[in-house]
């Protein structure tokens, strides 16, 4: 990628591609969270049906069902662009929208009961997992360093809108591991959103 060393990390589309190629299994397929010393299962059983890991992945998540959205003011809006982040070494394309549209897209998806995968910057003074809040920040261009799932909305006592985010760092904060992100933070610290095409269209 332009002479730069390829990173070992990826973005949301990297997970979709891995799931399509390698498959996934339900959480309870493994008796323990660390299981790479024993043979991997050839079959997955769910709701009385038998699947290979690839078949199971395709039954719950088809990569073609998803789209990626970003906001880059240096590129034309309403067009598919290659997001210029080191983690996008696969050179995937994203629909480029204005920052205000990011909020509108999330609100529309949540209104129709769809979660949204949020990818963005948390290495700044506005993010605190300990307090469960992501708010005011002065980040100029976000770095790609974390993913969370947007699952709901909340109102601050001052009337401001916050997004309820499901995080993966355990439950040790005042909100049982959830993080409440202000729409101001979402505007300035979002690298990408991943959601189904149905969610994007508000179906």
Residue locations for each model-derived region?
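Papain-like cysteine protease catalytic cores
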Residues: 1-56
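Active-site signature of cysteine proteases
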Residues: 36-203
């Amino acid at each position: 990628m332009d002479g730069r060393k390829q990173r070992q990390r990826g973005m949301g589309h990297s997970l979709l591609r891995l799931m399509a190629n390698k498959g996934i299994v339900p959480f309870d397929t493994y008796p323990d969270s660390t299981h790479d010393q024993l043979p991997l299962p050839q079959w997955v059983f769910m709701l009385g049906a038998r699947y290979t890991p690839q078949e199971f992945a395709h039954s719950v998540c088809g990569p073609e069902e998803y789209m990626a959205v970003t906001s880059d003011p240096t590129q034309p809006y309403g067009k598919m662009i290659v997001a210029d982040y080191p983690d996008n070494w696969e050179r995937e394309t994203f629909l480029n929208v204005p920052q205000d549209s990011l909020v509108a897209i999330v609100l529309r998806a949540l209104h129709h009961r769809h979660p949204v995968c949020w990818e963005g910057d948390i290495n700044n003074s506005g993010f605190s997992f300990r307090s469960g809040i992501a708010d005011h920040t002065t980040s100029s261009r976000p770095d790609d360093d974390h993913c969370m799932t947007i699952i709901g909305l909340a109102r601050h006592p001052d009337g401001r809108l916050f997004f309820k985010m499901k995080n993966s760092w355990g439950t040790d904060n005042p909100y049982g591991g959830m993080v409440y992100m202000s729409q101001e933070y979402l505007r300035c610290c979002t690298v990408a959103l991943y959601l189904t095409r149905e969610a994007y269209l508000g179906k």
